Amino acid sequence: MIEADRLIAPDNPVFKDEDVIDRAIRPKALADYQGQDHVRGQMEIFIKAAQMRNEALDHLLIFGPPGLGKTTLANIVANEMDVNIRTTSGPVLEKAGDLAALLTNLEENDVLFIDEIHRLSPVVEEVLYPAMEDYQLDIMIGEGPAARSIKIDLPPFTLIGATTRAGSLTSPLRDRFGITQRLEYYKVEDLQNIVQRSADCLGLSMESQGALEVARRARGTPRIANRLLRRVRDYAEVKGDGHICPEVADKALNMLDVDAKGFDYMDRKLLLAIMEKFGGGPVGIDNMAAAIGEERDTIEDVLEPYLIQQGYLQRTPRGRIATDRAYLHFGIDKPSNR
């Protein structure tokens, strides 16, 4: 797996120790939530309406690529509603009892946040349906012929589910969410604002153009932007006086092998393999995985999304194709037969 050594992988477990810093710089209110204007505008209305009616917010599904702020948005919703939030994830809820324990401890209008909700087991999902729809918990007591079902009334609550794979949710679960929000990759100017805000929270001396340099290479992802900012800070403190200007940011990011487009060595390895080994494509995913020594799932879930979104790679029925933009980026002449 490449996650362990990729600085720009959105879900890199190596950087879990930096979660404390992430929480410190994470916005707490919608007013501080940068970018995703359509989401912010809609949520302001939905939250205000729920507050005016003094009721729980409708169940909310948030989906999109990793690192775009799904957890941040869930916490903001709880803060704006002035309620408690309990956080868990799909893989952790192995048994129906695990979910029941969480649900029965919720107070009125509280938020239950389930990350990776697409990984819920069918047994747990079945328990969730009546809880979401009727605020009731159906539990089986006993086994065999003596088994009986009891119903437990739950207080009104808001379930917030987050996923990178909305298509993997079952239709019955997806249809029970009253609000659905898709998070998109961030514009550079929004990321620049996020980097500048994070620098201020960390007490860093940073020029706006320095923040822009970090934002340009952050792959449209706030989590990556904040991670790069911390590494640029390290470089500025060791190699200079701690002040981050565009030149310092550029040198630090080049040292990290993150180029002007936010590509690291794995992105370049993938695109170059298609162009140099397969004549630009089309090439099947399994052949591509073998060529670069990576797993199919890693290529599809980690490497490809950003390259496709930025127009450097195309998925076609016949396989993957490197685009004209990819050839231009690397300064390679496109084969005459393409």
UniProtKB/Swiss-Prot annotation:
SMART domains, alphabetized: AAA
Keyword Hydrolase tagged: yes
Enzyme class: hydrolase
Region (Head domain (RuvB-H)): 260-338
One function term, GO molecular function aspect: four-way junction DNA binding
One GO cellular component term noted in the UniProt record for this chain: Holliday junction resolvase complex
Subcellular location, principal: cytoplasm
Function of the protein: The RuvA-RuvB-RuvC complex processes Holliday junction (HJ) DNA during genetic recombination and DNA repair, while the RuvA-RuvB complex plays an important role in the rescue of blocked DNA replication forks via replication fork reversal (RFR). RuvA specifically binds to HJ cruciform DNA, conferring on it an open structure. The RuvB hexamer acts as an ATP-dependent pump, pulling dsDNA into and through the RuvAB complex. RuvB forms 2 homohexamers on either side of HJ DNA bound by 1 or 2 RuvA tetramers; 4 subunits per hexamer contact DNA at a time.
Protein's name according to its UniProt entry: Holliday junction branch migration complex subunit RuvB
Provenance organism: Vibrio atlanticus (strain LGP32)
Organism taxonomic ancestry: Bacteria, Pseudomonadati, Pseudomonadota, Gammaproteobacteria, Vibrionales
Encoding gene (name): ruvB
